[in-house]
């Protein structure tokens, strides 16, 4: 399956990314190769292979959900370049909130 440069530009726009024409062409080629490799899986004969739900030999391994005392606000904000009203202030990345 060929991924077109128009499709790469569309997904990049939705992701708020910008690529040069050369990068767009390279991504289209790379993504097309990846999709082709994945499509090869459709050719694998799985007749007689038991259906599985997981390939991992472990079940969910979770830690106990125990509250722990965190650092003080002063300690956390020690390396923050800019803050406002007890929040970390970061540069805006979306103009007017974006359209996504």
Swiss-Prot record:
GO terms in the biological process aspect are: glutaminyl-tRNAGln biosynthesis via transamidation; regulation of translational fidelity; translation
Domain of life, per the record? Bacteria
What are the record keywords, sorted?
Answer: ATP-binding, Ligase, Nucleotide-binding, Protein biosynthesis
EC numbers listed for it are 6.3.5.-
Q: Which reaction does this enzyme catalyse, per its entry?
A: L-glutamyl-tRNA(Gln) + L-glutamine + ATP + H2O = L-glutaminyl-tRNA(Gln) + L-glutamate + ADP + phosphate + H(+); L-aspartyl-tRNA(Asn) + L-glutamine + ATP + H2O = L-asparaginyl-tRNA(Asn) + L-glutamate + ADP + phosphate + 2 H(+)
Q: What does this protein do?
A: Allows the formation of correctly charged Asn-tRNA(Asn) or Gln-tRNA(Gln) through the transamidation of misacylated Asp-tRNA(Asn) or Glu-tRNA(Gln) in organisms which lack either or both of asparaginyl-tRNA or glutaminyl-tRNA synthetases. The reaction takes place in the presence of glutamine and ATP through an activated phospho-Asp-tRNA(Asn) or phospho-Glu-tRNA(Gln).
What's this protein's name? Aspartyl/glutamyl-tRNA(Asn/Gln) amidotransferase subunit C
Provenance organism: Streptococcus suis (strain 05ZYH33)
């Amino acid at each position: 399956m060929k991924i077109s440069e128009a499709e790469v530009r569309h997904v990049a726009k939705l992701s708020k990314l910008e690529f040069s024409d050369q990068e767009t062409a390279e991504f289209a080629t790379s993504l097309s190769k990846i999709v082709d490799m994945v499509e090869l899986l459709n050719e694998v004969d799985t007749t007689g292979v038991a259906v599985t739900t997981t390939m991992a030999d472990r079940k969910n391994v979770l830690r106990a959900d125990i509250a722990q005392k965190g650092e003080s606000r002063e300690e956390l904000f020690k390396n923050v370049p800019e803050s406002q009203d007890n929040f970390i202030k970061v540069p805006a990345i979306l103009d007017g909130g974006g359209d996504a």
